[in-house]
C-alpha cells in the first residue's frame, strides 16, 4: 500500500506559491502584476475542473506534496530502500534545493545557491530587461552579476559559456551599433524574433522566473523585431529570412513546377487553396506582400510551345523566314556563317521565292536539291544560281577559290555537301526506307545517289587540287624571296 496523504496537508498548486513568493519579493512592482495575470490565465481552468470534479474524484489525491517529504523512501521499508539505492543512504538533514521546493528562489537570501536557469535564459532576461532590447557582452555580464550574486564567486568559466551561447545559439544575433553609442569594443546582441517564443517557453519551464515581464512586454527594438507580428518562419522552411527580407527557395519552385507539369488537369482541379498551382505558391498578400509567385505557363501553352519548337526544327531549308536564323537538327551543320549566307541568298533568289510560295511537294524539293547540288562547289558567296550552266559555275568557282581559298574550302566544301545530304534525307523517301535493315543492305542504291556522290567527290578533289597548287605556288614564291634576300645580303 502506498503512502497516504495526511489530513493536515492540503493540495496546493506550485504556480500559486510561486506567484505569492514573487509578489512578496517584488511588492508593488510590474513584475508581480504581470506574473499574477499570467498565473490567473494559466491556472483558472484547472481550478474550475477541481471544483466541479471533486465529488467524482474523491479517491484520487494530489501528489504535489510528495516531494516535500524527507523520509518518503524510508516509509517504504528497508527492502525497498535496498533495491532502490543499495550503496548510498539518504541523509535526513539534506536541504532541498530551491529548484525542487515550493519556497521561492531568492538570490539575495541564498547567494551561494546556483540559480535554476540556463545561460540562454539568463542572457534572454538580461536583454529583455534593457530599455533598448540590445546589450553588449560586458553589460550582460554586469546584469548577471547584479541579479545573481552566485556568479561573483563562481569560476570564471561561466563567462565563456555566455559568449558561446551568444555566438552559437540561433536565438541571439548581432546588431550594428549606432554612431552615438560609445560601448567600446564588441557589438550589440539582441533576440531573434523568430526564436523569441522558444526562449519564453524555456523560461516558463523553469520553476521560478523573477522577470515575467518578458511574457507580456511588446518588443520595442525597431531593427530586431520588425516581423514579430507576422507568422512564424521556422528553419528549413521554403521561406527564410536574410537581411530582413523574405526569399523564396528557387530549387523547390523548380521542382514543384516540374511536378505540376506532369500532373493531369483533373488532379490539379482538386487542389485546395494554398497548395502549389501553376508552378507557383498561392500566398496571402497580407502576410507576404513582398513575395511574388513565379510566372509559369499553363500546361496547354507549354504543349503548344513544344509543338511549335518541333515544327520549327522540322522546317525544310527551302522555307526559311527572312531574317531568321536557320534552325538545324544536325549538330554538324551548326555553322552560323554558312547557313546565314545561304538563307539570305535563297530568300533573294527567284528560284527560292517560287519554291517557298508554291506548295512544298516532294518533287519541288527534289528539283531544288539537284540544282543546289550542281552548284555545290561555289565559293564563299554561297548563293544558288539555278539559271547558269555547270561550266560557268566551275569557272566562277576557280576564280573565287583563287581569291579566297580558305572561305571556299570551309563553306562550299564542307557545309554544302551536308546540306545536299540533308535535302535528300528530307525530300526523298525511298520505298526501301520502310524495309528491314538487312533488306536495305542487299538492295542497290539508285543511280541518282551514285551520280551525286561522284559529283561531290569530284568537287572535293577539285578543291583539294586547287589547294595543293596554291600551297606549292606560295612555297615557291617564299623560297624565291628568301634566296633573293640572301643574295642581296651577300
From Swiss-Prot:
Residues 384-409 have a biased composition (Basic and acidic residues). GO terms for molecular function: cis-regulatory region sequence-specific DNA binding; DNA-binding transcription factor activity; DNA-binding transcription factor activity, RNA polymerase II-specific. InterPro entries: FH_FOXN3 (IPR047404), Fork_head_dom (IPR001766), FOXN2/3-like (IPR047119), TF_fork_head_CS_1 (IPR018122), TF_fork_head_CS_2 (IPR030456), WH-like_DNA-bd_sf (IPR036388), WH_DNA-bd_sf (IPR036390). It comes from the Eukaryota. Gene3D superfamilies: Winged helix-like DNA-binding domain superfamily/Winged helix DNA-binding domain. Coiled coil: none annotated. Residues 417-429 have a biased composition (Basic residues). This is Forkhead box protein N3. It comes from Homo sapiens.
Amino acid at each position: 500500500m502506498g503512502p497516504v496523504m495526511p489530513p493536515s496537508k492540503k493540495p496546493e498548486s506550485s504556480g500559486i506559491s510561486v506567484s505569492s513568493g514573487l509578489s512578496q519579493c517584488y511588492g508593488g512592482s510590474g513584475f508581480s502584476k504581470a506574473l499574477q495575470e499570467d498565473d490567473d490565465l494559466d491556472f483558472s481552468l484547472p481550478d474550475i475542473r477541481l471544483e466541479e470534479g471533486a465529488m467524482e474524484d474523491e479517491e484520487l489525491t494530489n501528489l504535489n506534496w510528495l516531494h516535500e517529504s524527507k523520509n518518503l523512501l524510508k516509509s517504504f521499508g528497508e527492502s525497498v530502500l535496498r533495491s532502490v539505492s543499495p550503496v548510498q543512504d539518504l541523509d535526513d538533514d539534506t536541504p532541498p534545493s530551491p529548484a525542487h521546493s515550493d519556497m521561492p528562489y531568492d538570490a539575495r537570501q541564498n547567494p551561494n545557491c546556483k540559480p535554476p536557469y540556463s545561460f540562454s535564459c539568463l542572457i534572454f532576461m538580461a536583454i529583455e530587461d534593457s530599455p533598448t532590447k540590445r546589450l553588449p557582452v560586458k553589460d550582460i555580464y554586469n546584469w548577471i552579476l547584479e541579479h545573481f550574486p552566485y556568479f561573483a564567486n563562481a569560476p570564471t568559466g561561466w563567462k565563456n559559456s555566455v559568449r558561446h551561447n551568444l555566438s552559437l545559439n540561433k536565438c541571439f544575433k548581432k546588431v550594428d551599433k549606432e554612431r552615438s553609442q560609445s560601448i567600446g569594443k564588441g557589438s550589440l546582441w539582441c533576440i531573434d524574433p523568430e526564436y523569441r517564443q522558444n526562449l519564453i517557453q524555456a523560461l516558463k519551464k523553469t520553476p521560478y522566473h523573477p522577470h515575467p515581464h518578458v511574457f507580456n512586454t511588446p518588443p520595442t527594438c525597431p531593427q530586431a523585431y520588425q516581423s514579430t507580428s507576422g507568422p512564424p518562419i521556422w528553419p528549413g522552411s521554403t521561406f527564410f529570412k536574410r537581411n530582413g527580407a523574405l526569399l523564396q527557395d528557387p530549387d523547390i519552385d523548380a521542382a514543384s513546377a516540374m511536378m505540376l507539369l506532369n500532373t493531369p488537369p483533373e488532379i490539379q482541379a482538386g487542389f485546395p487553396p494554398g497548395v502549389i498551382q501553376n508552378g507557383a505558391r498561392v500566398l496571402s498578400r497580407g502576410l507576404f506582400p513582398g513575395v511574388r509567385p513565379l510566372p509559369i505557363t499553363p500546361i496547354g501553352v507549354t504543349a503548344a510551345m513544344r509543338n511549335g519548337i518541333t515544327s520549327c526544327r522540322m522546317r525544310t531549308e527551302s522555307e526559311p523566314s527572312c531574317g531568321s536564323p536557320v534552325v538545324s537538327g544536325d549538330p554538324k551543320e551548326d555553322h552560323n556563317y554558312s547557313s546565314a549566307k545561304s538563307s539570305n541568298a535563297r530568300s533573294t533568289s527567284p528560284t527560292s521565292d517560287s519554291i517557298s510560295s508554291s506548295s512544298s511537294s516532294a518533287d519541288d524539293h527534289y528539283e531544288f536539291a539537284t540544282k543546289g547540288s550542281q552548284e555545290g562547289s561555289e565559293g564563299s558567296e554561297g548563293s544558288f544560281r539555278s539559271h547558269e550552266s555547270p561550266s560557268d559555275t566551275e569557272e566562277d568557282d576557280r576564280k573565287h577559290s583563287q581569291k579566297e581559298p580558305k572561305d571556299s574550302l570551309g563553306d562550299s566544301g564542307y557545309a554544302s555537301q551536308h546540306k545536299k545530304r540533308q535535302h535528300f534525307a528530307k525530300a526523298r523517301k525511298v520505298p526501301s526506307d520502310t524495309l528491314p535493315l538487312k533488306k536495305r543492305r542487299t538492295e542497290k542504291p539508285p543511280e541518282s545517289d551514285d551520280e551525286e556522290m561522284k559529283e561531290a567527290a569530284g568537287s572535293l578533289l577539285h578543291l583539294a587540287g586547287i589547294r595543293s597548287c596554291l600551297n606549292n605556288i606560295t612555297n615557291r614564291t617564299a623560297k624565291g624571296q628568301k634566296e633573293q634576300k640572301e643574295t642581296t645580303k651577300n
